[in-house]
Amino acid sequence: MNTLEKARILGDAGRYDSCGPKACEVKVENGLGGIYHAKAEHKTCRIFKTLMDNSCSFDCRYCSNAAGCSKNKASYEPEEVAGLFDYLVKNLAVEGLFLSSGVSGNPDKATEKMIEAVKIARTKYRFRGYVHFKVLPGTSYELVKQASELSNRMSVNIEAPNSSIMQELSGCKDYSIDILRRQRWISKLGLGGGQSTQMIINDMSTDKDVLKMSDWEYEKLDLRRVYYAAFRPVKGTPLENEKATPLTRQNRLYNSDFLMRDYGYKLKELYEIMDEGMLPREDPKLALAKATFDRPLDLNEASYEELIRVPGIGPKTAKTIILNGGVKKYEELHKLGGWVKRARPFIEINGKRQSMLGDFDVA
């Protein structure tokens, strides 16, 4: 099998790992697998996302690479993937590498090959850009440390919000030891780009389960991002007949995550709009505003913390309103980046407003 054939197989196999919200990941169709435009923090980065090896001894019931699943097997040698990546950097303007692997044999053996590949890219090919290194569950501390010295960001996929659900998904991963312990190691190593993780969203968990774990990860481990992957059944896996998770659920989890990370909302506030542990179908910020606003907020008297709780006003717009000393009319709010239609039922300007809370369709 030549390198191009491997790239198609291993690049396609790497699509299940997130390097950004799925709605912000766009695969580049160029006949070569694994190249994505990933958008994060208002910037777009072209990433080569691939596995080193798609053979795996783990038994994850949702994964096409799991032991026992039939597939086209392929693996890179370290020099091979480093050389391919160098070619992509020089010819396709790829700016970063996202490297993961199946666990063929044991985690340390697989990780050693990944480290060697990144080391070659850094030394022989003098790549100084972004590397996201996927830490495999069960990897030894010494190898995690070595990988951290070559990487900008690292991640271990927790996949589930707690150990009981993990047991339903995989019989060979110890949630506390193989996963959470590795996350603690990464946290203490202090990477410039920090660490992230991913959870699979399916019917085994509620939104309350998921957000409770995300909140813990942000608070205790100082994670930069938690990514949410709506479950998609894969043919040939034990869960192939389970129903897919609606993307609307994934999106509402992202909305709620942003509220906790960027807007200062507390987890317990989100609990207030849940029904049997599930978020409403509408935007959670809008649902919270409907539940908590008992009077309109005057834009010229409000603090930054109050402004960002108004639907249609984000952190950037709120900061601009404060810096400008307020606004005089709705058209000015629009020019500053506010979504006037959504915000207007909840606001007034200098004590004046044009509508009641129920007068507008703000969905």
Predicted segments — roles?
Residues 49-79:
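Canonical Radical SAM [4Fe-4S] cluster-binding loop centered on the CxxxCxxC motif
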Residues 82, 105-267:
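Conserved AdoMet/S-adenosylmethionine-binding subsite of the radical SAM
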Residues 238-309, 338-363:
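Long, highly charged, low-complexity intrinsically disordered interaction regions
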